[in-house]
Structures are given as structure tokens and as C-alpha cells.
Amino acid sequence: MKVLLLQQPKSFSNYPKWIEEIQERFDCLEVMVFTSNDRAAHHSWPSSVIKEIEVSDYSSDSATAKFFDIVRKFKPDRIVSSSEEDVLRVAEARSLFGIPGLQHELALSCRDKVTMKQSALDAGLKIIPYTTCQGFGDIISAFDRWETVVLKPRWGAGSAGITILHSKDDLPALATKPEFIRNVHSNQYYLEEYCSGSVYHVDVVYINSGSILISPSRYLVPPLDFEKQNTGSVMLDENGADYSELLRLTKQLIASFNDQTIPNVMHIEFYKNETGDFVFGEMAARRGGGLIKQELAAAYGIDQSKANFLLELGLVDADANITRSS
């Protein structure tokens, strides 16, 4: 098997150890690593890693072009990555070159927030009211509909780049920022109504249709406050109504993907509004940030990053543990 492994600069995933653990399960395993020269972790790779390719700017268009060229020449059987910024380009490569795994259509729904909202609607989930943003006129008009407006990057990750607008008076200051103007006029933002309810996250490891780890939790601090306060969350009581409802909604969302390849790991956010209903916020084809990975490892004994690696290679068995330890 030929594997192209992408390790983004901030990753500390122990890929060398995981590769050593599984390389004997293949008659011939060849791994090529695509990474950055400013990465946080420099590894000593096992013998099955035949080449490590470095780029100077991992997120750049030139790096993406280099990645596609590697796929074209190396012809990998699988591509492995756990980074949000890799989701779309890896899925596009899979679709373009006929490689198994998450494909472009569903990956787009996990990256573009506007496409994501429509996917949630199609799944029968409630969503926060939103509208597109192609200029300042759209932002002004949004205040005719909503008291508080949230300006979000369409392609953002987590809570980065989000701006809460309390009135039209907030706009003149933003209009003096060249980068903001450029992003507004190039359709890089969308607008949604501010939702003041509690925020929940659901973390998923998808093994197969009959074996899915679904772990609902409630944030102790809203994600939008991640720059002001230490964020954290608490797992919900498995016998509680909120747990059952989030389990149901998550299964309903996953079922709506039909015959598409499901992401190995997912991080989904819901809001609980004033009437007690859960409203879809966002979904991502990656693990959750902060200490969510460690929480799941403690509760279930599953490392989401390692599970993603193994699942991409078809090496996680159907009887993998999805039961929370007491």
C-alpha cells in the first residue's frame, strides 16, 4: 500500500509510532510525508517512510499545487490528514484521482459554512437564520432582521475571525480595514443572527454504520470567548434528555449523507435556544480542539487522531470500544 501522509506544522501526532505498529500488516507499505519546514515536531521516521517532502508555506496555493503534483506522480492508495486546512484539498485530490476516503462534495459541506447550513437543512435540522454577505449593504440590511449580527468567515476554523456586531455604528471602524473590505467584497463572509443559548459539541468517531462513537458535551464557556477565557466542557449524562436528543440529531445528520464516505472523525456544534430546542451550528471533518481529544481518550480509550489514521487505512475493527468508561 502507498500512503501519502500530510502532517500540518502544529501537529504533534505520533505518526512514526503508529506506522511502526501497523507496517507489518501490509506486504509492502510505502509512506510519503508532506509537511512544512517550520513544523513543531521533527520525527525520525521508520523504514517504510520513503520520503519526507517539505514546503515553506504549508497553507499556500503553491503548497497545494505541490501536493497535487505529488499525488499525480506518487499515485497513493490512501491519503491521510487530520487538519482542517487539508480537508478540502485532500478530498479534491481523492475525487480527482479516484482515491478512497472523504470526497469533495461532503468535504465542501464540512468547510464552506453556507453549503454546510444547507446540508443541515436538507437533513431536517433546525439552523440559525443566516444570509450571504457580498458587501456592506448586506450587513446593513441584516440589522433590519436581527438585533445583533454575527459576521463569520465562510471558510474559517473554530471561532477565529468571527465578529459580533451590536449595531450599524460598528461598521465605520471596520470599513477602514483594507483586509476586511477585501474579504467582504470577495464573498469570504456570511451573516447570521446572534444566538445567545448554551453551546454544545458532539464528537464522533465513525467506524461503520453499526459502530459510531458519539459523545455530546456542553461548553462551560462559549467558544466565541476563547480569547478571553479558558474554554472547557463537560460530557453529558448518558441518561439525560439532552444527551439522547443530541445523539438522535447527530445520527440524523450522518444518515443524510447517504452513500457518501463519512468522515472518520467529526466535530459538530449545536446551540440550545431559549425554547429548549437544539439548533445546528457547524460541523467539521476533524477532531475538536482544546482538550476534547484528551477527554475522549480518558472516557473511551480512543485517540481520535490515531483512530483517523487507522480508519483511513482500513485497520480499525468493528468491535472497537465506543462505550464510555465509568
Cite the ranges covered by each PLM segment.
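Short beta-strand-to-turn element immediately C-terminal to the catalytic PLP-Schiff-base lysine
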Residues: 133, 162-167, 205-207, 273
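Conserved ATP-binding module of the ATP-grasp superfamily
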Residues: 126-130, 148-151, 164-197, 201, ...
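Short acidic-hydrophobic, aromatic-tinged amphipathic segments that line or gate anion-handling sites
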Residues: 51-59, 130-135, 163-165
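ATP-binding N-terminal substructure of ATP-dependent carboxylate-amine bond-forming enzymes
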Residues: 1-105, 315-318
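ATP-grasp fold ATP-binding core
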Residues: 120, 143-164, 183-197, 202, ...
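Peripheral (often C-terminal) accessory segments that flank ATP-dependent C-N-forming ligase machineries
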Residues: 4-5, 122, 139, 307-326
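ATP-dependent carboxylate/phosphate-activation module, predominantly the ATP-grasp catalytic core
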Residues: 193-199, 203-261, 272, 280, ...
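A conserved helix-loop-beta module that forms one wall/lid of the active-site cleft
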Residues: 94-161
